[in-house]
A protein has these predicted regions:
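Extracytoplasmic gate region of multi-pass secondary transporters
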Residues: 26-27, 206-252, 256
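Helix-breaking motifs and short loop linkers at transmembrane-helix boundaries and internal kinks
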Residues: 38, 70, 91-96, 124, ...
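Cytoplasmic helix-loop-helix junction between adjacent transmembrane helices
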Residues: 101-137
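Symmetry-related core transmembrane helices of the 12-TM Major Facilitator Superfamily/SLC fold
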Residues: 161-178, 362-380
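C-terminal transmembrane helical hairpin of 12-TM major facilitator-type secondary transporters
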Residues: 269-315
Length: 396
């Protein structure tokens, strides 16, 4: 029991770091990246999109690794690589080294995807609660990230110091993971089956592939808002950096609050909840791009975070329950869907931002939210009607 509690604490604390000084650190700094390196919206969108693809490939690879060997080594490698690449970004003074190190930072964070199947196993029959709590910790990190950036800029006069903080925190957490994470024999055991078969077979299961499409769409909703809304507020409205970062903070507060509530209440989100949230999100977004009062903007940003906050953990828990094995491989497929969505939609918003303005490019977010609600409903219906056709390939 004590070992399980320690494992849960390590997993949740990592996802707090992931949101605070991992890729969650990037949205508040997009405008700073553009200004420091002379990067256009289009180029910045492509760089972030490619980073998302790198992250997804890393998450798929580490998912297969987890199904065979467990997650301790992969999560430890995440800590070291994040620390090294973050420190490198601090010293990068030209665009090419910066882009290379930013992609390495995405790669390192992608390896951390192994934490999802770890938590799914640790919480067993309470997977929905476990996923909501895990992503609530990520949300807390993302909530604090804009404050961290603002504090670093205020105290040092430069945004790069935030990456020094990132390197220090990941470096401190490395020994905690390496020496503290104790995997159960069941996770560490291997059978003589080819675990890659699980990934191939999953491609033929309609519920799984519909779920992957759902991750693609939800990423188009949440990542475009997190990445581009602060930039839009700074560049195309009368609001400044302080208001933009405060709006992002308010959004992350709603994003986190709903996950905490769902985790503590052990609540399961249904397709009806998702549909209502998608409609409310579209209305809140429409108002947020037109208001001039900062306090109304903050309220609308909070409401938007409240709407899309449950999307990722709810869909992941539903698929994990549908197929209760091979969760490492499934997590990799989720990562492929969500980060491919981030690549496509974040890049598209950047291109549209240069052509017609970010106000119109960001319309992608509410549209993706509505289509995601449809996909979630279809996934829910198919999961009730069908049994998974994938034979278990390893003891997970």
């Amino acid at each position: 029991m004590a070992t399980a509690r320690l494992n849960k604490a390590i997993c949740h604390s990592y996802y707090l770091l992931f949101g605070l000084v991992g890729v969650g650190l990037l949205p508040p700094l997009v405008k700073s990246f553009e200004d420091s390196y002379g990067i256009s919206h289009t180029t910045m969108g492509i760089v972030l999109g490619v980073g998302a693809v790198v992250l997804s490939l890393a998450s798929l690879g580490v998912g297969v690794w987890y199904d065979r060997r467990g997650g301790r080594a992969a999560l430890s490698a995440t800590m070291l690589l994040c620390a090294v690449s973050a420190l490198g970004i601090y010293f990068a003074r030209s665009v090419v080294p910066f882009v290379a190190l930013l992609l390495a930072f995405h790669l390192a964070n992608g390896l951390g995807a192994v934490v999802s199947p770890l938590v799914a196993k640790l919480y067993a029959e309470e997977r929905a609660r476990g996923m909501n709590l895990l992503h609530a910790f990520q949300g807390v990190g993302r909530l604090l990230a804009p404050m961290l950036v603002a504090a670093c800029i205020a105290l040092s006069g430069q945004w790069r110091v935030a990456f020094v903080v990132s390197a220090v925190l990941f470096g401190i957490w490395f020994p905690l993971v390496w020496f503290g994470l104790k995997e159960t024999p069941q996770v560490r055991s291997r059978q003589h089956h080819d675990t890659s078969f699980g990934a191939i077979a999953a491609l033929h299961d309609r519920v799984v592939m519909l779920g992957v499409a759902g991750f693609f769409l939800l990423s188009g909703c949440e990542m475009t808002l997190m990445t581009w809304l602060p930039n839009f507020l700074e560049s195309e409205t009368q609001f400044g950096k302080t208001e933009a970062l405060t709006a992002l903070t308010a959004m992350m507060l709603g994003y986190t609050a709903i996950r905490i509530v769902l985790g503590l209440r052990r609540s399961r989100v249904t397709s009806l909840h998702i549909a209502i949230s998608a409609i409310v999100l579209a209305a809140a977004f429409s108002l947020a791009t037109r208001v001039s009062d900062p306090y109304l903007l903050y309220c609308l940003a909070f409401l938007m975070g409240l709407c899309f906050g449950p999307y990722w953990p709810s869909l992941a828990a539903a698929i994990y329950d549908y197929i209760p094995w091979g969760h490492g491989t499934l997590t990799g497929l989720f990562g492929i869907g969500s980060t491919t969505g981030a690549f496509v939609f974040v890049s598209a918003v950047g291109v549209l931002g240069d052509i017609v303005g970010l106000r119109y490019g960001l319309l992608i977010a509410p549209v993706c939210g509505i289509v995601f609600a449809i996909a979630y409903y279809a996934c829910e219906v198919l999961a009730r009607r069908n049994k998974p056709r994938i034979a278990p390939t390893c003891d997970v």
